[in-house]
């Protein structure tokens, strides 16, 4: 007879939620992770009283009330709203691109005016079907915004000219013809007040966790301990 019903590889969000659901269903679960901490890429640590996101900032956001009701069982969330601002040569511009951005650059005040300006610049560039990131960006927000707020940043990020980058990279870029600085268009959003690590610890409460264990380094032995590996 196997020692565990489930061996969960990875103590990130997926692994922790699966382990919680399995344990609540009466299953015996072991969670392992090759890192020396739980929470995967949403791991947060306290540095001088500040919750630092070691692997980059993560903002929880969803429109699904069932998901929200579930996750708030394990953490209290603040009402953090991500409203980035870009500084270009001393001028501040709202992100994601929205009517505040278009008003600052072109002086337009209605969605119709902004859409017309974008279309005008798209036609001036002769773009019908975008074939690279530059053409896709101009199609989405016009040449002025592309030159000021996209081109330099993107080329620095990827180390290649925008004309050599595929169009799909920027297709998910939020563009809104409304006065809305909220990066995520989601009903529920925020960051756990106690940090993501504490939230994941709450999810894993009462569940056996072993850190510093690399599944791929001893796959057969570890897999033999459980009925199923997740």
Map each language-model feature to its residues.
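Short hydrophobic core segments
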Residues: 7-9, 32, 224-230
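N-terminal Rossmann-like FAD-binding beta1-loop-alpha1 element of flavoenzymes
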Residues: 4-31
